[in-house]
Amino acid sequence: MARKNLGRRKIELVKMTNESNLQVTFSKRRSGLFKKGSELCTLCDAEIAIIVFSPSGKAYSFGHPNVNKLLDHSLGRVIRHNNTNFAESRTKLRIQMLNESLTEVMAEKEKEQETKQSIVQNERENKDAEKWWRNSPTELNLAQSTSMKCDLEALKKEVDEKVAQLHHRNLNFYVGSSSNVAAPAAVSGGNISTNHGFFDQNGNSTSAPTLPFGFNVMNRTPAGYNSYQLQNQEVKQVHPQYWARYY
């Protein structure tokens, strides 16, 4: 009689309940996985890192050329990628700040340029206005003629004020010095006659006395006297033509 078998059938993948079978299966499958990884490295010159943890928590690893080197390389890529993103964000922020600063500088430059143009225009207009006297009145338009008239009136007003100030100053000078009378010129030699008409309080005519020969009119010093003799005495002479003076 022929023996019957189950034949091929699909085995359901579930966790083994038998502890011994579990350990044996893990050991076989781990060795096979590491063997396949070694073949892949040999055939394709690939870099492989395999880490397996047993049901008890023990770790097993396989790597080519080195597990630690591959792990550091993989982690370094992640850190480098993060650093690259941070650098890009920082660069974008810096560029944005520089663009804002550039915009402000350009606005200030345009404002200064407008101010400069306005100043140059005002200087040109003032320079042209200062040459109004060089142009003939027939060459001026209505606005220029009106401006010229106002300037002439203002100039005339300033000149009149200056003339009035000078006239008032000269008038005060003459009023303050009206009491001063010029002394007569000195005459040397002979008798000096000062017969000029004078009147006293009663209206009677008087005449100045004749000075003796050698009498100095300017210092009233008779002939034969020197200045040393007059230093010890006070000489007071009243001339009828002038008020009382002390010499």
From Swiss-Prot:
Disruption phenotype: No visible phenotype under normal growth conditions. Expressed in roots, leaves and shoot apices. The keyword Coiled coil applies. It comes from the Eukaryota. The keyword Iron-sulfur does not apply. One of its GO terms (cellular component) is nucleus. Residues 91-168 form a coiled coil. One of its GO terms (molecular function) is DNA-binding transcription factor activity. Keywords: Coiled coil, DNA-binding, Nucleus, Transcription, Transcription regulation. Residues 6-66 form the MADS-box domain. PANTHER family: AGAMOUS-LIKE 50-RELATED, MADS BOX PROTEIN. Probable transcription factor that may function as a floral promoter operating upstream of known floral activators in the autonomous pathway. Plants over-expressing AGL28 show an early flowering phenotype. This is Agamous-like MADS-box protein AGL28. It comes from Arabidopsis thaliana. The gene is AGL28.
